[in-house]
Amino acid sequence: MPKASHQDLRFAFRELLASGSCFHTASVFDPMSARIAADLGFEVGILGGSVASLQVLAAPDFALITLSEFVEQATRIGRVAQLPVLADADHGYGNALNVMRTVIELERAGVAALTIEDTLLPAQFGRKSTDLIPVEEGVGKIRAALEARVDSSLSIIARTNAGVLSTEEIIVRTQSYQKAGADAICMVGVKDFEQLEQIAEHLTVPLMLVTYGNPNLRDDERLARLGVRIVVDGHAAYFAAIKATYDCLRLQRGQQNKSENLSATELSHTYTQPEDYIRWAKEYMSVEE
């Protein structure tokens, strides 16, 4: 079977957005996982920013990974991927001009789509880690991203955190990003269908949700009727890989009979050492939780 080009995969992603169905992403974090996901029939994969930070730096999701490091990983995946890959480009690695550079590099890497979020990243001195940038700045980033892409089939998705805003504020932000030309709107932190319905009735572009398995949003048909086309449940495949590596190496060392049996989440927490970063952020930056 002939190999799909990067543009073929971008068109395939746009077909997902234009469909009447809801699709769940596969967590793809290296070339092998991308091939496995495609072979198993997943329609779309996602390279998460948090997963890239774990894979490249063994560091928590504190905006520590650089653009070049993220692009390198996306490029490795793009060489072999035969499913559309959506890149979680965090905040675009800086201001609107940095966003333009991010789009240029990720387009060359072969991703089918990318998200740009309006979280204030990296964390700023004396600010909360969940603070958002002004909506006007977010609009500027989306407009800059659209200007920077060469291949118009590359989807630019605006992302915001519904978990730290009122429903009215979410509507204002998402409508602003829609008006700026975003191909879709991504939201994290939507609580339930009632809130989603209130937001969705004000939007016409396709929606993407990061739910992390929220049980209040587990109804694909209902999600699809509200315009949701892409759902990110989390990155279970990556954490399963961490767990499998730990268990295999533990067995090789003859430690399989020990009572310790850490979960994937506990292992990730142990080996990324987030307490150190939290302490440093408080000590050197007065960053609030």
UniProtKB/Swiss-Prot annotation:
Co-factor note (free text): Binds 1 Mg(2+) ion per subunit.
GO molecular function: magnesium ion binding; methylisocitrate lyase activity; oxaloacetate decarboxylase activity
Gene3D superfamilies membership: Phosphoenolpyruvate-binding domains
UniProt keyword list: Decarboxylase, Lyase, Magnesium, Metal-binding
Cofactor field: Mg(2+)
InterPro entries hit by this protein: ICL/PEPM, Oxaloacetate_deCOase_bac, Pyrv/PenolPyrv_kinase-like_dom, Pyrv_kinase-like_dom_sf
Entry keyword annotation includes Metal-binding: yes
Biological process annotations from GO: oxaloacetate metabolic process; propionate catabolic process, 2-methylcitrate cycle; pyruvate biosynthetic process
Reactions the enzyme catalyzes: oxaloacetate + H(+) = pyruvate + CO2
The protein's Enzyme Commission number: 4.1.1.112
Positions bound to Mg(2+): D88
Pfam annotation, one family: PEP_mutase
Binding site for substrate: S50, R159, H235
Enzyme class, broadest EC rank: lyase
Similarity remark: Belongs to the isocitrate lyase/PEP mutase superfamily. Oxaloacetate decarboxylase family.
Quaternary context: Homotetramer; dimer of dimers.
Record's function text: Catalyzes the decarboxylation of oxaloacetate into pyruvate. Seems to play a role in maintaining cellular concentrations of bicarbonate and pyruvate.
Protein name as annotated: Oxaloacetate decarboxylase
Organism encoding this protein: Pseudomonas putida (strain GB-1)
